[in-house]
């Protein structure tokens, strides 16, 4: 993971542990965060100062979204990564759900490669709906790269719909 640079990274989302793991593994990163987190005292300020993007660019967050998107291309070119959980929420059954296309649109706009990551078993350690860690079972958390979509030419990046199909295909192949 440490070798990934200048990329948009999409990952399945199973548990509240997932963003913490990716933050720990990725040296220079930004991410798209649920907009409501930006309204929380102190935490919202920290997210804004860290360069994170609100998931919605509506209302009071429009200016922040525009500012962050305008700087994204140079951030990626300097070796930074943008990671996102494109489902926008945790999966309750472990299967990939419908994807929001925001990260894929940013990849096209910035002509950045898209790395598709798959996390496994974080939901067994920190089950959605539970408050405590489940330490009664033996569990191995894994994270692997299951696809990398490289731009072939600045003017020839696949459409957002094609990128979405390829991401979904990579996840569905892993679920078999």
Where are the predicted features?
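Structural alpha-helical scaffold elements that stabilize or flank donor/cofactor-binding regions
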Residues: 2, 46-47, 106
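Short, solvent-exposed coil/turn elements at secondary-structure transition points
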Residues: 1, 37, 58, 120, ...
